[in-house]
UniProtKB/Swiss-Prot annotation:
It comes from Rattus norvegicus. The keyword Transmembrane applies. Residues 23-964 are extracellular. Keywords: Cell membrane, Developmental protein, Endosome, Glycoprotein, Membrane, Neurogenesis, Repeat, Signal, Transmembrane, Transmembrane helix. Residues 197-209, 228-253, 283-298 have a biased composition (Polar residues). GO terms for cellular component: cytoplasmic vesicle; early endosome; early endosome membrane; plasma membrane. It is a single-pass type I membrane protein. Residues 1-22 form the signal peptide. Its main location: membrane. Glycans are attached at N430, N522. This is Dyslexia-associated protein KIAA0319 homolog. Highly expressed during development in ventricular zone, intermediate zone, cortical plate, striatum, hippocampus, and brain stem. The lineage of its organism: Eukaryota, Metazoa, Chordata, Craniata, Vertebrata. Gene3D superfamilies: Immunoglobulins (2.60.40.10).
Length: 1081
């Protein structure tokens, strides 16, 4: 139950507050021919248009919250928010028209007294856009220097200093009178926590406006509500009267208190012999204020209390909100005796204003007078109010200093109570934490629609720019015509909406330029097409959405599905302006196909704009998603362990063999343990250097990390030993024998030994070894030498090993490569088919067909190699075996047999056309007088020897070198001579036969009675003897074969011959022979 005096004092306080709320803003002190010297970086000045007198300027300042000073300068009005006293200090100047008028506002006085500077900072700027830019102020006020103040001015030293001391800077000692006067402007906080603000209007709205003033940048409604809720805790607040005062305190509102000013109530103690007065703050807001404003501090009523009274009717006060680490105030009270308490002058320091990210502060209390020499004061700090989301740290040690950290945005009120022997005092301090300074973002101009198409008879259009955005406020819109039929300025209106009418056919382009409250601008354009005839717009089709996964970072977007009723004349690709901006490479941006490369992880949006022959356009969007590939953890490789020989004191730590699927971004070397400290260089690189090594074993750890944060570690050991080195012993592996077709081998030199370890291996091919044969990789620098493609012959390799001290040793390895025992049986079959087109199934079919042709089993045909011969032919090397045990058939016989069998087949028996069948190797002996060409498979004979042409072309056709050139030449010469002789004889015989005519043989008849004259020898004409006359001794009558000649011989004596003939005939009949005389010739 509350006592009647307490109820009466509460009613009086409410009446005083209600009376003060109705008082209006009034004019304060005025200075003529004076200016101020502000710092333009920490003051807010706004120029007001359409003011005609000093009174109008002062009225404008009264109407604007947080305006402290009305400045009339050369016919222009400027409203000033001082923020700090030195910013509004008047200075005299020359005879110019300049008047400074400070305004007075009715406020209620709070017990949490703040000095002027902190109150100005706490007020901030008014809600909305407040203050002109520095460039505009310097143009309007050219006399301001670089620091924002006048270049040469004098100060109003007396009256403004008196104003500052008496009015602007309240003293820590409270005015003992019932009220205080504030002639120029009120500097103390009102009951709702604001400073120098009008008490009229809705308290909730005023609270929101004040919170905006405390914020360096405009807040939206949600942020304001959050800040209001966090400014004052909804829990019951600490009452400034929560402690039992050691003297009687009575609430006595004065006339000034009834006019709206809340005063400090002080009353002398009747039994206090010292005569000092104890300040008693009054914190009683009106009930309406408590109910309507969420930021209003809850305070208890003030009661008349008898010191140390234990009457059950005496009211008790609510405890203050004390956070962990703070001690609730407790007062040493004696229940039986009454003592005189000495009042201490306690100051908690100036009110603080912090701006995030600075959230730390230190409060320090000072007391006057100082404690006696042998005693000390007791300090108790308590948190009176704090934001709801307060989670800061308070370091309380019952000392004069209080440490604060991790403070959030809002207002904090602290109270410190200092007590000593028969002495007590308390002080208050406010800490205001403001949000971080706002960074202005330029506005974004948005027009809707961007492209608008109309067809006659429609000639009116509307373009909406109200969707433009800004982080603060857009203050102006400006439209202008960029292209198209001229409209004139009458059609353009500087408003968010552009209304157009009576438009002529054509293409129009309008630009919208917007300006925000900070002067930043942005512009965009809108296109308007007025068509005279009906033409349907094109339909853009950018294709379906695409998704790719890294490492693939290229793709082609296809827009050729776009259509139009006439013709599309232009394709345009560009990233969607509303999407995220990522780096990429675009090619073919004005073609139907957009080539994209160097894409990164994320989502891309592209817009395709197509334009038809009449200029109509259409757009379509396509989304491309680039997904990250699965990331694997890196693999750290610190390298092999090292052994060093003292006095070597440094080593290289090589981690460059560490790997990751996306690349390693971070290396870090650490010295884990060892016999002594070492110095390391480049510990964040792949290769580090360590120095200062001593004899012993050191352990180092390498940690690698990839782009996604995955890491891996590896450990390296470095052993430093004393010098005692023996040369190494090389072992190359001895002699090895290979038999073709096996043409690969590994020579193992790892059995080489050294007392400290071999650091390098080097394999060297002997100069007399065949040049053919390949070394795989860089194995010639390793312990094992890997060889392949060896040919028939003997290879010699020398192994050279070296230890860490440079000592070396060598050894030799021999590799003998023997010919293939199946070499004589390998057949080469060339088919007209590309090697890439021959399948395994087709190969098996070919094997079966060859087995049929050769009359063997499928398993007897062994395919050794299949390789390309040309781009359109393939070589198959195989051999044929038969019998048990298996015996390889001669390649020449197999090839000859295949030739015969294939030549008998009418059609193509094999799957593919056969281009050639031959032995794989050149197997001809060449009769021991030449060698076989491995390419042409023919004998190349030695000098003086040649091929047996008969065998080559008439018999088996095998190339050979059987004939000697000498024998062939002699035989050819002999044949030539014989042929010539026979030919000459034949010619001669033919000529003689043509000159000689053969006579008929003469028939002779033996005559019995022939005289001596008649027995003369008959000779042929021209003296040629007849053979019959040489052998016949008797005369015979003959009929000459040359009757014609006889007729010719005896033609002259025809008559005589006729007589003779008659006689002869008669004689013949009678057996008498004829005679032949020479004279008859």
């Amino acid at each position: 139950m509350v006592s009647p005096p307490g109820v009466l004092s509460s009613l009086l306080l409410l009446a005083a507050m209600a009376g003060g709320s109705s008082q209006q803003c009034s004019e304060g002190r005025t200075y003529s021919d004076a200016i101020i010297s502000p710092n333009l970086e920490s003051i807010r000045i706004m120029r007001v248009s359409h003011t005609f007198s000093v009174g109008d300027c002062t009225a404008a300042c009264c109407d604007l919250p947080s305006c402290d000073l009305a400045w009339w300068f050369e016919g222009s009005c400027y409203l000033v928010n001082c923020m700090r006293p030195e910013n509004c200090e008047p200075r005299t100047t020359g005879p110019i028209r300049s008047y400074l008028t400070f305004v007075r506002r009715p406020v209620q006085r709070s017990g949490q007294l703040l000095d002027y500077g902190d109150m100005m900072l706490g007020r901030g700027s008014p809600s909305g856009a407040w203050g002109d830019s520095l460039e505009d102020l310097r143009k309007d006020l050219p006399f301001l220097g670089k620091d924002g103040g006048p270049e040469e001015t004098a100060e109003y030293s007396d009256d403004y200093k008196e104003l500052e001391r008496g009015l602007l800077q309240p003293s820590n000692q409270q005015d003992p009178r019932g009220s205080a006067e504030y002639p120029d402007w009120s500097l103390l906080p009102s009951s709702d926590g604001d400073f120098n603000a009008s008490a009229t209007g809705d308290n909730s709205a005023a609270s929101t406006e004040k919170l905006q003033d405390l914020t360096p940048y405009p807040l939206d409604q949600e942020q304001l509500q959050s800040l209001n809720e966090s400014t004052w805790s909804p829990t019951p607040r600490h009452s400034e009267m929560s402690s039992m005062w050691p003297s009687s305190v009575t609430a006595s509102p004065t006339e000034e208190g009834l006019e709206g000013e809340e005063t400090l109530q002080l009353q002398e103690q009747p039994n206090n012999s010292s005569g000092k007065k104890v300040p008693m703050p009054s914190h009683n807001p009106s009930p309406a204020s408590l109910e309507s404003s969420p930021t209003t501090v809850e305070k208890s009523s003030i009661f008349t209390v008898t010191p140390w009274s234990r009457d059950p009717g005496t009211p008790t006060f609510p405890a203050s909100t004390v956070l962990p680490g703070l001690i609730s105030p407790s007062w040493p009270l004696s229940p039986t005796t009454s003592r005189t308490v000495k009042a201490l002058a306690v100051s908690a320091g100036d009110n603080l204003v912090l701006t995030l990210p600075n959230g730390e502060a230190e409060l320090k209390a000072s007391v006057e007078p100082a404690p006696p020499a042998d005693t000390a004061y007791t300090y108790e700090w308590s948190l009176m109010s704090h934001p709801v989301d307060f989670q800061g740290k308070i370091k309380q040690e019952n000392k004069p200093t209080l440490h604060l950290s991790q403070l959030s945005v809002g207002l904090y009120a602290f109270r410190v109570a200092v007590s000593g022997e028969n002495a007590f005092g308390e002080g208050y301090v406010n800490v205001t934490v403001m949000p971080a300074a706002r960074i202005n973002q330029p506005p974004v101009a948005i027009v809707s629609p961007q492209i608008q198409e109309l067809s006659l008879p429609l000639t009116s259009a509307l373009i909406d720019g109200s969707q433009s955005t800004d982080d603060a406020e857009i203050v102006s819109y400006h439209w202008e015509e960029v292209d198209g039929p001229f409209l004139g300025e009458a059609f353009l209106d500087d408003s968010p909406l552009l209304r157009l009418s009576n438009l002529d056919p054509g293409n129009y382009t309008f630009r919208l330029t917007i300006t925000d409250s900070d002067g930043a601008t942005n512009s965009t354009t809108a296109a308007l097409i007025i068509r005279g005839s009906l033409d349907y717009p094109p339909v853009a089709n950018a294709g379906p959405n695409q998704t790719i996964t890294l490492p693939q970072n290229t793709i082609i977007l296809n827009g050729n599905q776009s259509s139009d009723d006439h013709q599309i004349v232009l394709y345009e690709w560009f990233p969607d302006p509303g999407g995220e901006s990522k780096e990429m490479v675009m090619q073919g941006a004005q073609t139907p196909y957009l080539h994209l490369s160097e894409l990164q992880e994320g989502e891309y949006t592209f817009q395709l704009m197509v334009t038809d022959s009449s200029g109509q356009q259409s757009t379509a969007l396509v989304t491309l998603t680039v997904q990250a590939e699965n990331n694997q953890a890196p693999v750290a490789v610190a390298g092999p362990d090292k052994e060093l020989v003292f006095p070597v004191q440094s080593a290289m730590l090589d981690g460059s063999r560490s790997s990751d699927d996306h690349g390693i971004v971070c290396y870090r070397w650490e010295h884990i343990r060892g016999p002594s400290a070492v110095e390391m260089e480049n510990v964040d690189k792949a290769i580090a250097t360590v120095t200062g090594l001593q004899v012993g074993t050191y352990h180092f750890r390498l940690t690698v990390r990839d782009q996604q944060g995955l890491s891996s570690t590896s450990t390296l050991t470095v052993a430093v030993k004393k010098e005692n080195n023996s040369p190494p012993r090389a072992q190359a592996g001895g002699r090895h024998v290979l038999m073709l077709p096996n043409n690969s081998i590994t020579l193992d030199g790892s059995r080489s030994t050294d007392d400290r370890g071999i650091v390098s291996y080097l394999w060297i091919r002997d100069g007399q070894s065949p040049a053919a044969g390949d070394i795989i990789g860089s194995s010639d620098n390793g312990a094992a030498l890997q060889l392949t493609n060896l040919v028939e012959g003997v290879y010699t390799f020398h192994l050279l090993v070296t230890d860490s001290q440079g000592a070396s040793d060598s050894d030799t390895a021999i590799v003998e490569v023997l010919p293939d025992p199946k070499k004589d049986g390998m057949v080469e079959l060339i088919l007209q088919v590309g090697v890439e087109q021959l399948t395994e199934q087709q190969k098996e079919t070919l094997v079966r067909q060859l087995a049929v042709l050769l009359n063997v089993l499928d398993s007897d045909v062994k395919v050794l190699k299949i390789q390309a011969h040309t781009d359109v032919s393939t070589v198959i090397v195989f051999y044929v075996q038969s019998g048990s045990p298996f015996k390889v058939l001669r390649a020449a016989d197999v090839a000859r047999n295949l030739h015969k069998r294939l030549s008998k087949e009418k059609g193509a028996f094999l799957l593919f056309k056969v281009l050639r069948i031959d032995t794989a190797g050149c197997l001809l002996k060449c009769s021991g007088h030449g060698h076989c060409d491995p390419i042409t498979k023919r004998c190349i004979c030695s000098q003086l020897w040649m091929e047996n042409l008969l065998q080559r072309y008439m018999w088996d056709g095998e190339s050979n070198c059987e004939w000697s050139v000498f024998y062939v030449a002699a035989l050819a010469l002999t044949l030539t001579v014989l042929t010539g002789a026979v030919t000459w004889v034949c010619i001669c015989c033919c000529r003689r036969r043509k000159r000689t005519k053969i006579r008929k043989k003469t028939k002779y008849t033996i005559l019995d009675n022939m005289d001596e004259q008649e027995r003369m020898e008959l000779r042929p004409k021209y003296g040629i003897k007849h053979r019959s006359t040489e052998h016949n001794s008797s005369l015979m009558v003959s009929e000459s074969e040359f009757e014609s000649d006889q007729d010719t011989l005896f033609s002259q004596e025809r008559m005589e011959r006729g007589v003779l003939k008659g006689s002869l005939n008669g004689s013949a009949r009678s057996g008498v022979s004829f005679g032949y005389y020479s004279k008859d010739r």
